C-alpha cells in the first residue's frame, strides 16, 4: 500500500510562503504608507491644477472639465460635481455620460497610486508594470472617447473651476499609518494563504489534475489551463488573483503573457458583478436609478469591448 505524504509538501510550502509574504509585505506596506502620505498632501490636486489651463481650451461644458480634474484626487468629488451641476441644470444628461467616460483615466490613475503601484508591481514585477500600463491604456482610451463625445455635444461655456478643499496635512502621517494597518490586515493573510495554496497544490500535482477539466476550453484559445484557474480566482477576489499570479510566475507555471491574459479574462468575467457592487450604488445615489444605471452600463460595455480587443491582441502575439 502506497502512503502519500501530504504533510511534508504543506510544511515546505508554508515555509516558502512565510518568507515570500514577509519579504513582499515589507515592500508593499512601505510603499502603501508613502503613497497614502503623498496622496494626502494634495499632489493629485496640484496635478489637476497643472492640467487645468490645457483642458480649458477644450470647447466643452466647464463642469465636465471640473469633474475630470477633481477625479485626479477624488473620483467621488468629481462625480458629485456632475450631480450638483445636473440638479442646477448647468449640465445635461448626455454631458454627464460623456464626462463619466472622460473621468476614467484620472480615476484609474488615483487607483494606480493606491493599489497598482504599491501592491501589483511588487508582487508581479515587470508583468505587474505591463498590467498597470494595460489598465491605464484602457482608461485613457475611455477618456479620449469621452472628450470626443463631449466636444460634439457640448456648448461653449465660460470656464469656472469649483473650489475643492485640501486635506489636512497635520493628520497625514496618522491617517496614512492607520490606512496601511487596515490594508495589512486584509493583504497579509490573503498573501500567505494564496501563496501557500499555490505552492502546495503545485507540489502535490493538483494543477495537473485540474488541467483535464479546464483543458477543453483553454485548448480552443491555445492557452495553459492554469490561465483559467487564475481568471476564476479573480472572480472571487482580485487581491487573491494577484498573489496567485505571483505564485504562478515564481514557480514557472505561467509565463508573463499568460498571467496578463488570465488577469484580463478575469476582469472580463467579473466586470458585471464589480460594476453592480461598486459603481452602481454610487451612480444611482448621485444621478438616480435611470441615469445612474445608464452611466454604469455605458462604461461597462466600453471597458468590456476594449478588454476583449486586448485579449485578442495578446493571443496573437
UniProtKB/Swiss-Prot annotation:
Keyword annotations: Cell membrane, Membrane, Transmembrane, Transmembrane helix
Similarity comment text for this entry: To M.jannaschii MJ0880, MJ1556 and MJ1589.
Topology relative to the membrane: Multi-pass membrane protein
Protein name according to UniProt: Uncharacterized protein MJ0871
GO cellular component terms, semicolon-separated: plasma membrane
Keyword NAD: no
Lineage: Archaea, Methanobacteriati, Methanobacteriota, Methanomada group, Methanococci
Chief place where the protein resides: membrane
Superkingdom, natural source: Archaea
Compartment annotation: Cell membrane
Transmembrane segments: 24-44, 63-83, 136-156, 187-207, 229-249, 252-272, 295-315
Amino acid at each position: 500500500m502506497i502512503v502519500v505524504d501530504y504533510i511534508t509538501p504543506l510544511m515546505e510550502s508554508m515555509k516558502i510562503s512565510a518568507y515570500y509574504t514577509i519579504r513582499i509585505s515589507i515592500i508593499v506596506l512601505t510603499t502603501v504608507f508613502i503613497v497614502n502620505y503623498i496622496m494626502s498632501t494634495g499632489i493629485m490636486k496640484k496635478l489637476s491644477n497643472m492640467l487645468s489651463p490645457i483642458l480649458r481650451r477644450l470647447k466643452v461644458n466647464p463642469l465636465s472639465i471640473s469633474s475630470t480634474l477633481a477625479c485626479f484626487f477624488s473620483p467621488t468629488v468629481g462625480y458629485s460635481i456632475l450631480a450638483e451641476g445636473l440638479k442646477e441644470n448647468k449640465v445635461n444628461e448626455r454631458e454627464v455620460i460623456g464626462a463619466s467616460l472622460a473621468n476614467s483615466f484620472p480615476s484609474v490613475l488615483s487607483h494606480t497610486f493606491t493599489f497598482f503601484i504599491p501592491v501589483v508591481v511588487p508582487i508581479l514585477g515587470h508583468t505587474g508594470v505591463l498590467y498597470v500600463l494595460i489598465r491605464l491604456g484602457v482608461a485613457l482610451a475611455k477618456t479620449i472617447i469621452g472628450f470626443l463625445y463631449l466636444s460634439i455635444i457640448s456648448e461653449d461655456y465660460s470656464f469656472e473651476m469649483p473650489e475643492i478643499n485640501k486635506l489636512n496635512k497635520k493628520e497625514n502621517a496618522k491617517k496614512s499609518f492607520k490606512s496601511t494597518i487596515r490594508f495589512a490586515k486584509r493583504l497579509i493573510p490573503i498573501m500567505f494563504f494564496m501563496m501557500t495554496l499555490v505552492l502546495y497544490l503545485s507540489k502535490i500535482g493538483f494543477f495537473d489534475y485540474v488541467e483535464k477539466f479546464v483543458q477543453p476550453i483553454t485548448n480552443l484559445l491555445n492557452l495553459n489551463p492554469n490561465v483559467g484557474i487564475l481568471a476564476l480566482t479573480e472572480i472571487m477576489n482580485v487581491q487573491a488573483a494577484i498573489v496567485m499570479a505571483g505564485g504562478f510566475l515564481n514557480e514557472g507555471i505561467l509565463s508573463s503573457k499568460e498571467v496578463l491574459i488570465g488577469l484580463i479574462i478575469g476582469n472580463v468575467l467579473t466586470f458585471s458583478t464589480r460594476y453592480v457592487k461598486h459603481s452602481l450604488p454610487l451612480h444611482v445615489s448621485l444621478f438616480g436609478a435611470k441615469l445612474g444605471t445608464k452611466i454604469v452600463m455605458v462604461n461597462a460595455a466600453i471597458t468590456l469591448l476594449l478588454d476583449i480587443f486586448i485579449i485578442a491582441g495578446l493571443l496573437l502575439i
